[in-house]
Every structure is written in C-alpha cells, then in structure tokens.
C-alpha cells in the first residue's frame, strides 16, 4: 500500500512537470508569435503612413546634395522606413567633409579678391606716408576700403540668409513630422505625452523662428556694422556697444534654449510616467477582472503598442537624420565663409596691421556668431525630437 502511494505521488509529479514544460513551451511560442505579429503589423502600418510631406524634404536633400552620396544612401524615404536600405553615418560624414572641401574651393575666388583689395589698401597706405598724406592717395585708399567693406557685408548678408533659410526649413520639417510622430506616440500608449507635446512644440517652434528672425540675426548684423565702423576712425569707437548687442543676441538665444529644454524634458518625462502608470493599471484591471476576453484584449493591445513603438522609433530616428542633414549643409556654408575671412586676415597680417586686417577679423567673428546661433537652434530641434522618442520608450518601461 505504501509502495502504491509512492508510485502514485511520483506519477503526479511527472505529469505536473510535463504540464509545466508544455505550458512553458506554449508561452515561448506565444511570445514568439506575438513578436512576429507585432513586426508584421509594424510593416503593414508603415505602408499606410502618410509620409508625403516628410518625403518632400528628403527629396530636396537628395536633389541638392545627392551627388556627394553613394548609391546605397539614395532612394525614397519609404525604403529606409521599411528597412530596404539602411542609413550609414560614415557615408554621410564623408559627404559632409567633401561638401566642406567643395565650399572652401568655391570661395577661393572670394579669398583672391580679398587678398588683392587688401594689398591695394596697403600700397595706398604706403603712398600716403611717402607723399605726406597726399589727397589723391587718401581718396583712392578710401574707395578701395569701401569696396572691401561692401564685399564683406555682402558675404555677411549671404551667411545670414543661409542660416535663416535653414532655420525656416527645420521649423517646417518639425511641424510636418510632429503630427505623424505624436500619432504613433499616442497609439503606443502615450496619449498624455502626445496631448502635452503637440501645443508646446508648436508654440516653441514658432517662437524660436520669430526670435531668430526678428531679434537675434538683426542684433548680430547691427553689431557687425558697428564693429566695422569702429575700424574706420581712431577717434570714435563703438566697439563696446557692438559687443553689448552681440551678447544680448546670444544671451537671449541661450535663455530661450534653457527654457525650451526645461519645459520639454521635465514636463515630457512626467507625462510619460503618467502614461506608463495609466497603461499598466488599465492592463491589470482588464486582464484580471474580465475573464478570458480581458486577457485576449490585453495581448492584442500589447501587439499594437509594440508595433507602434517600433514604427515610432524608426520614424523618429529617420526624422533626426533628416533634421541633421537640413542643418549641417548650410552650417558648412556659413563656416566656410568664416574660414575664408579668417584665413585672409591671417595671411595678410604680415603685410601690416591697420583697419583692413581688423575689418576682416571682425567679419570672421561675426559669421562665427551666426554659425553659433544656427548650431544652438539645430541642437534645440534635435533634442526636442529626442525627448519625444524617449518619452514613448519611457512609457513602455513604466508599463
């Protein structure tokens, strides 16, 4: 009898163990099927996404700068979203360096003009000293110097146009990308985050554009003019006022960047935590208090959320890449102009100092400030997209 009890107990343990193994295998198969279903759903959803507006920006980049890229980095935006083609940072870095080299060579004519005008100014200045302040040489020197100033201001205006157009293009791209990104964020369980980001992003994007166009760029331009005027005479200097205006412009931009990042990061993180807790609570209640159907509903919801999260990360990463391309090429143009003026000042300084060399150095520094303003705005847009992408991932972590 006791032997029979031991045999019965052993049989029960074996059956229970086999049941656990079968159940574990079933769970593994269910998890694998769930992952495959989420991946298939993401591919099917990607095919129905409205990417026409974003695709226009991508096509513009391909049209203007596609000649610098290999064939592996060319193609439609949907090919990159579906995974048919992969984004290669190394190839794009090579393209950026090639474009920088091309811009420096293209500005070689400007460098030659600056060198010739500066040499003429130095020769005329020597003639003034030789002929005891001859009126003719003074007039000729003034004319050549004015031509140099006009050329410098024209280059400065071109740099401002490059930066302004790049900021406008980035703003338009963000406004086109945000609805798509927030829709995917909401479908992945981030309804509160999407409701928070939509008005805040729209307000801050438009405010940044107005700040750059109406305050920052005009102040930098006025500061450059005052600095150039200060080089014309030794008696009347306005360099302190020029420095003050420049500091106000950069300071206003830095303050706005701080406010922007503070609002986006702190409030965005709290909204993502709220989404995660809400989603977890709803899943627990549905799965435990509604028999059979509740568990099926939560599994289907997990599939949709996983697919939306996968698609959101893909679209977000491609959006960040396009944003970097929109900002990088104009920034290289601005940086090449600053390099040309700095190089001209460095080459010609051994011929003698004076207002001409100072003017070239002033223009170089002012163009660098334009580059800094463009870089700050680009960083602000880049971090805003990064926070939106991270908010969805944080929601899933909380769930």
From Swiss-Prot:
Compartments, as annotated in UniProt: Cell membrane
Known role: Required during sporulation for activation of sigma factor SpoIIIG/SigG after engulfment is completed in the prespore. Overexpression in the absence of SpoIIIJ is synthetically lethal.
Domain of life: Bacteria
Record membrane topology: Multi-pass membrane protein
Keyword Coiled coil: no
Cystine pairings recorded for this chain: none
Signal peptide: 1-24
Species: Bacillus subtilis (strain 168)
Gene name per UniProt: spoIIIAE
Segments passing through the bilayer: 104-124, 140-160, 172-192, 209-229, 248-268, 315-335, 368-388
Deletion phenotype: 4000-fold reduction in sporulation efficiency.
This protein's UniProt keywords: Cell membrane, Membrane, Signal, Sporulation, Transmembrane, Transmembrane helix
GO cellular component terms listed in the entry, alphabetical order: plasma membrane
Name of this protein: Stage III sporulation protein AE
Coiled coil spans: none
Subunit-level organization: Interacts with SpoIIIJ and YqjG.
Record flagged with keyword Zinc: no
BP GO annotations: sporulation resulting in formation of a cellular spore
One Pfam family this sequence matches: Spore_III_AE
